[in-house]
Amino acid sequence: MSGRRKGCSAATASSSSSSPPSRLPLPGHARRPRRKRCLVPEVFCTRDLADLCVRRDYEGLRRYLRRFEGSCVSLGWPSQCIYVVGGEHSPHSLTEIDLEHCQNDFFGEFRALHLIGTVSHATCRYQVFVDAYGAVFAYDAQEDCLYELASDLAGFFAKGMIRCDPVHESICARLQPNVPLVHPDHRAELCRRSRASARGRYLRSLLAFRELLACEDTAARCAYVEAHREAQLTLIWPEKHSLVLRTARDLGLSASMLRRFQRSLYTREPVMPLGEIEGAEDKTFFHRVRILCGDTGTVYAALVGQDKLVRLSRDLRGFVRVGLALLIDDFRYESIGPVDRSSLYEANPELRLPFKKRRLVVGYFDSLSSLYLRGQPKFSSIWRGLRDAWTHKRPKPRERASGVHLQRYVRATAGRWLPLCWPPLHGIMLGDTQYFGVVRDHKTYRRFSCLRQAGRLYFIGLVSVYECVPDANTAPEIWVSGHGHAFAYLPGEDKVYVLGLSFGEFFENGLFAVYSFFERDYVDEIVEGAWFKHTFAGMYELSQILHDRANLLRVCQLHAGSKIRLGGSPACTFTFGSWNVAEADEANNFVIGVLEQAHFVVIGWMEPVNKAVFMDAHGGIHVLLYGTMLVKLAETLRGFIRQGSFWFRCPRRFCFSPLDSSATVAAKPVSSHTSPAYDVSEYVFSGRSVLDSVSGTGAS
């Protein structure tokens, strides 16, 4: 037995030494195939690209771009916008002459730029550069200008081309195909004049700042400001604006306020004031804006009434180049050419800026089926969120005011279009004043008594037609007070209308309180029924004789005894003639007789409120409430038939004129504004004003 065991063990040992033992599969388990080791394929990573740019490893950046040349990355905005990786050897690369042009002719000094690829949108291509600080730029060869897209690559991939004006223009041209575009020759001339103007304004500003730029540190800058107090240094933009050098004592900035400014910064560096901005006129958006400079040379702006600083540029020379353009989100760099000492005296004072810098607005319009249900606006999630932010109450004493929630919501949903109950196909595009570029002074709104008593005001958007971007100069502005009241300011009329005392009233009525909508020109019966919902068939004949009082009275006499349904809500019936007035009592007969001596003529009766309706000597429509109490309902008989008894639903004053106006300005209809043609033109715009000699507005 022992020998046999020894033989078996020896055989086993010899077999184990010659070949490895095979692992037998366990019962119930299949044998797994052996996997081969393989290398994971490398893919393009935005973090690796950003890391190379931050470390300024330009040799590694060049190799990385060459390795992943042709890779595509979708940008954050707009949709279908692609970033294509590529370097100096890519087929769409710039020439050396173009690269030197971008490095020398845009910033007033040489700035090293490294090409990292191109951005493709529609049929356009934009070369993308990164500088030594990590900022990303895009070059528009058609207009010969640079756009600063973001301060780093992470912001570039998140924001995309939202700072590039040609992309906004192409999107607006696609949304509004009927709007005529600027002729290419005229546009080229505007760009040439803009480049010449930018160079002249930059040379003047550089000449004014040359001594301050020579200061090497903060102590030297403080000494220069102290020695040159009240000196005015011209800015490149805005025009006719300058930086007035002032110390902290002159500006009223205490040490605690400077520390508060310092805590609002990301790096929390010490800051020193340089001065404040003054313009040619006091009514300017940039008046009293304070300019501060940090120890690292970064220039900040302190807006009026705010405790946070806004970063303008990384150094003082950059501030001389851009001015206050970043406050309106203008990141465009014009080609100003090379600048040296001999060119500082080339500034031509006759050069003017040909067109105003402004931010383009892009709206987001949902389909009509998702906005309306049986002709009425849906109470969508955007409306619901606006209501919650509008009616927010403070549950705790230390929580911020409700207006902060409303402002945050409006900024988060900027560009969304919400339909109004009336007029048809009209709505409000949400956004704050910075989004639309509204730069009016608050004194403009404080001229109205209703806004003086409203407390704090919050801007929530502009009124526009469906699929049309509003114009900030003419579109009605919607404001909300701290008490929850809704107001509409019409710049063309310079009037304020009270739309509602709550969110529910604003949502139910829309712009029905804006009387100028009811003085539009007559189009046809279908439009009259869709807009105003009255049953008067002779509206066309009535529109031809609005300012002829004798013919108006003749029309009322011809329709004596006929009943019509007035527009608006609540539903009321109007009877032409004066037959029902004869049945009034003796007191009312006496009042009516006195009014007739004052050239007030009875033209009919309103039911079911049972009130007599009068026409004054100028064609205005009044209603007799009780005793000698008269309320003016409309400027013309046409406006009265269209708007109807809306005042009886909300018996209060709707329209307010400025307190400093010496004479009452005629209320022009909204249709008199010059606007491009749209697909819904039969509902909206016409080109002729119908009120030439009328004073006041409805229910004023």
Curated annotation (Swiss-Prot):
For this record, the Gene Ontology CC terms, alphabetical, are: host cell cytoplasm; host cell nucleus; virion component
Record's keyword terms, sorted: Early protein, Host cytoplasm, Host nucleus, Virion
Q: Does the keyword NAD apply?
A: no
Q: Where is this region: Disordered?
A: 1-30
Indicate the principal place this protein occupies in or around the cell: virion
Q: Which InterPro entries match?
A: US22-like
Cell compartment(s), UniProt: Virion; Host nucleus; Host cytoplasm
Tell me if Nucleus is a UniProt keyword of this record.
Answer: no
Q: Where is the composition biased (Low complexity)?
A: 9-21
Q: Give the quaternary structure.
A: Interacts with UL38 and host HDAC1; these interactions are necessary for the HDAC1 interaction with UL38. Interacts with host MTA2.
Which family, according to UniProt?
A: Belongs to the herpesviridae US22 family.
What is this protein for, i.e. what is its function?
Contributes to activation of immediate-early gene expression.
Per its record, how is this protein called by name? Protein UL29/28
Question: Organism source for this protein?
Answer: Human cytomegalovirus (strain Merlin) (HHV-5)
Q: What is the lineage of its organism?
A: Viruses, Duplodnaviria, Heunggongvirae, Peploviricota, Herviviricetes
